[in-house]
Amino acid sequence: MSIVKSFAVDNGDMFYIQHNSDNFTIIDCNLNAETAGERIEELKLKSQHKGITRFISTHPDQDHFGGIELLDDKMPIANFYVVKNKATKSEETESFKHYCKLRDDPVKAFYVYKGCTRKWMNQTDEVRGSSGVNILWPDVNNPDFKDALKACNEGGSPNNISAVVWYALEGGATVMWLGDLETEFMEKITDHIVLEKTTIVFASHHGRDSGKIPDSWLEKLDPQIIVIGEAPSRHLNYYTGYKTITQNRAGDITMELVDNKVHFYVSNPQYKRSDLKDEGADTFDNYIGSIEVETEYTLEGATA
């Protein structure tokens, strides 16, 4: 069993994976003085028995590293996985300065790229098992990525240098994170990234139209659930034809991955679903239903 949690952190992203091995992974953060204490205490509690904790930064955007200095102060980051960049900002926040400090640290930083390997991210040895995390993008030699990196390093948008992170529970569900990749960029790299059927996909750019996952990707991913993050409703794309969970309504979303099933829990007790199977799961509060992991392509969805 493993746990994947998506925090409701306003217009930003923050996740963790409590692996079924000796690993704990945090993906992005968006903390402030009001929320940091409770969030960090949960991270410390959930990771306390894990030998390896890593932080994966998808890209250098304020709402994906906000409050990282608060996290690092209370829960020191020893393994910082990041796309290599020299991003610049017209206004440097304390969080950006701290991000740069971690990014450029010769000991703590590990620069991720398509197909990279590392103990114990995706390699196993006699000490501990793999986390099951793989990096599908960026291809640092791809010309479109190089253009996006150049723009980012010159003070432009960092969205299209986002890492694509893919997690697989052995014999169970798969989960994908896309950072803030934009639709046009995803279309450009369709033939240069390996995509396979994925159980749960976190929509790019918090579900905004600007990060709508193109059909060319959705056909390969064939997701059972698309999670739409927090953004103003007028900017969201609701992915007609697919089952979705919207963080604006659900609040924190906790996914319990058990064998070939995923049980879903939310922090909003008023949020209900009738299109998920009732397995009677009760590990956490506010259970809303479950899915059984598909292994064959269906290319059929249901509006939710």
Question: Predicted segment positions?
Answer:
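Hydrophobic/aromatic beta-strand patches that form the interior of the parallel beta-sheet core
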Residues: 5-7, 25, 56, 81, ...
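Active-site metal-binding motif and surrounding structural segment of the metallo-beta-lactamase
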Residues: 25, 33-87, 192-208, 219-226
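Active-site environment of divalent metal-dependent phosphoester hydrolases
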Residues: 11, 33-34, 60-65, 86-90, ...
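Long, structured stretches of catalytic cores involved in phosphate-ester chemistry, encompassing
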Residues: 97, 190-263
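Active-site-proximal beta-strand/loop segments in catalytic clefts of secreted hydrolases
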Residues: 28-30, 57-60, 83-85, 114-116, ...
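Metal-dependent catalytic neighborhoods of phosphoester/phosphodiester hydrolases
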Residues: 65-74, 90-100, 213-218, 237-240
